[in-house]
Regions:
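Short, acidic, metal-binding catalytic loop of nucleotide-sugar glycosyltransferases
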Residues: 57-66
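Aromatic-glycine-rich donor-binding/catalytic loop that engages nucleotide-sugar donors
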Residues: 193-223
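Acidic helix N-cap motif at the loop->helix transition within catalytic regions
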Residues: 53, 77-86
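Conserved donor NDP-sugar-binding/catalytic core segment of glycosyltransferases
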Residues: 127-161
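Short aromatic/hydrophobic "clamp" motif used to bind/position activated sugar donors
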Residues: 117
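Glycine-rich, basic loop-to-helix element that forms the pyrophosphate-binding segment
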Residues: 94-112
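Short beta-strand/loop segment that forms part of the nucleotide-sugar
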Residues: 66-75, 93-95
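Short, flexible, basic/aromatic active-site loop/helix in glycosyltransferases
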Residues: 166-204
Length: 223
């Protein structure tokens, strides 16, 4: 996957993976009809280039639900972030300093009123309808505390965004062999490779922070 510091985008596609809910089943969003629900997308920007523009533009077709986009501006190029936000109807928050990723995301979510919240890196490019597929997966899996999409690298390969909780042996094997033998069995197990890794919905131990969807009720319980 492209990291947040690189300008080449990662694609968010429509094949969700989920992490078990550790705070109890959350059903507030499920009381509304799907087309009545709303979603807030939060992203943290630090002197972004064209990546933020692509991110915001792609969100226009990612969901048919009511969408609110909030950008936490942690950098110094405030005019660039503000201009991009104005072009795409987003809101910018920040105090002019670098709050850090977590604090920036929390600030952007501070007044959350929507039914769902997404925290995503600004170098993602959303495929049409992909956010709705992700939310639909959340509705179909009410015990999931957090969901993430299938992430594609710029070359179309799958980034292992849903991973297992490694044992000591598997973790050590992945750490030692991962770079010199990428397809080793320890890394494959850690990356939860195998059937279903590139499609459908599956349960994983943890999800990449590049793109996370949570029911608003689950987010509030974490505060």
């Amino acid at each position: 996957m492209t990291s947040v510091a690189k300008p080449t985008p990662t694609s968010a596609s429509a094949a969700p993976v989920s992490a078990p809910d550790q705070v109890g089943e959350c059903s507030e969003a499920r009381a509304l009809a799907p087309d009545e629900q709303s979603v807030r997308v939060v992203t943290v920007a630090f002197n972004p280039g064209e990546e933020l523009e692509r991110f915001l533009a792609s969100l226009a077709t990612a969901t048919a639900r009511r969408l609110v986009v909030v950008i936490a501006d942690n950098g110094t190029e405030h005019d660039v972030v503000t201009a991009a936000a104005q072009r795409h109807g987003a809101r910018v928050v920040g105090d002019g300093t670098n709050l850090g990723y977590g604090a920036g995301a929390n600030l952007a979510a501070a007044d959350l009123e929507e039914d769902w919240i997404v925290v995503a890196n600004p170098d993602l490019v959303w495929r049409p309808g992909s956010l709705d597929v992700l939310i639909d997966a959340g509705l179909a899996n009410p015990a999931a505390g957090c969901l993430g999409p299938l992430l594609l690298n710029p070359d179309g390969t799958v980034y292992p965004s849903g991973r297992a909780l490694p044992s000591l042996v598997k973790g050590a094997g992945h750490a030692v062999l991962g770079r010199i033998w990428p397809d080793n069995p320890f890394s494959a197990a850690y990356h939860t490779a195998g059937p279903g890794a590139s499609g459908g919905t599956r349960t994983v131990g943890w999800l990449s922070g590049a793109c996370l969807l949570l029911p608003a009720a689950a987010w509030r319980r974490l505060e």
